[in-house]
């Protein structure tokens, strides 16, 4: 439970003018402050019309007051919402009057933080509030809404419950070290490990998809000069964003273009062609291209279909660190009918459009997996969630290895670390600095 005794206030509606503006109070003085503002009577979950007044009794604004009594509110505390006209000037004056009456200005995300501390939301759900607000399209909004409804958290808890049962069996085996593991539920341990690994693998796959829906995909077009990278970016973007000429080395700097592709944002980055030599400006362009690869989720390796092997040699090991790669043979319209095509690459023509639909399909597969949703549907996730799940997966694998050598103490420690990684997602185990970073990124009124 939160130990806070302060009452906080902030504008909860969107910035700018509008038909309605909302000022939100949360804390033990919320109701008292509303009464002092001029709200004659307040009943829980009833709307009351009132004139909100300043210290001299002059009317600041008129509107509706709503009281949500603790613990039946978003934050778990007494909450009052004052709904007036959407004038930033009047809303700021109303906040200032609330502060005069004993409230303090809320920090960014403090309402959601109090909801978390009071057990109204777990940490993943609290983060989903910001994701719902920031969603760029309907698919991302629905995924964030499912995370807010607890779909992601329940699946994390299911894995954690499986690990709890495993830890009980392993700890029992440690306490009765003279007994063989099989007589202490060894089969249950092995079955539990299999179940935990399966659940984790499925959850990690779906969380990576959820992260892509939330954050999009950073795809870098890489390849030798004159392979048609800029032409391909223009074809995918549907506009002439990059300069295209027949002169090798035309692209000297990086160019970013965001496109929407089946519910997620794909950021394409055109880069300078990689080759030996070149002038100082071109060499700087190649350095920037390699720097973009270090941040890439996906490398789109664009080669000239007429001589892909020579083009491949020019790239060298530049793409080795990129987790996902897609090889594209461009200019396939210039090939003779008898020319062989690499079955592992996609043949396209940025000029004629040949193969672009197949490229779109492959990009969707790389971004969102096989397209098969879980029973609960897609949910939004963040990079920290994916990293925590990967750590949990590594620790479960390590526990399996230690159990194979009957190193029970080491296996128990690995399972504990896996459990801890899952707890970081929902906030059951969280460092104070992590909470501070998460909630400080929220809107003031959230």
UniProtKB/Swiss-Prot annotation:
It is an enzyme of class 3 (hydrolase). It comes from the Bacteria. Mg(2+) binds at residues 230, 251. Its cofactor is K(+). K(+) binds at residues 226, 245, 247, 250. Its EC number is 3.6.-.-. Transmembrane segments: none annotated. One of its GO terms (cellular component) is cytosol. GO terms for molecular function: GTP binding; GTPase activity; metal ion binding. Disulfide bonds: none annotated. Its main location: cytoplasm. Keywords: Cytoplasm, GTP-binding, Hydrolase, Magnesium, Metal-binding, Nucleotide-binding, Potassium, tRNA processing. Residues 216-368 form the TrmE-type G domain. Binds 1 potassium ion per subunit. Pfam families: MMR_HSR1 (PF01926), MnmE_helical (PF12631), TrmE_N (PF10396). (6S)-5-formyl-5,6,7,8-tetrahydrofolate binds at residues 24, 81, 120, 446. It is found in: Cytoplasm. GTP binds at residues 226-231, 245-251, 270-273. Belongs to the TRAFAC class TrmE-Era-EngA-EngB-Septin-like GTPase superfamily. TrmE GTPase family. PANTHER family: TRNA MODIFICATION GTPASE GTPBP3 (PTHR42714), TRNA MODIFICATION GTPASE GTPBP3, MITOCHONDRIAL (PTHR42714:SF2). Homodimer. Heterotetramer of two MnmE and two MnmG subunits. Exhibits a very high intrinsic GTPase hydrolysis rate. Involved in the addition of a carboxymethylaminomethyl (cmnm) group at the wobble position (U34) of certain tRNAs, forming tRNA-cmnm(5)s(2)U34. This is tRNA modification GTPase MnmE.
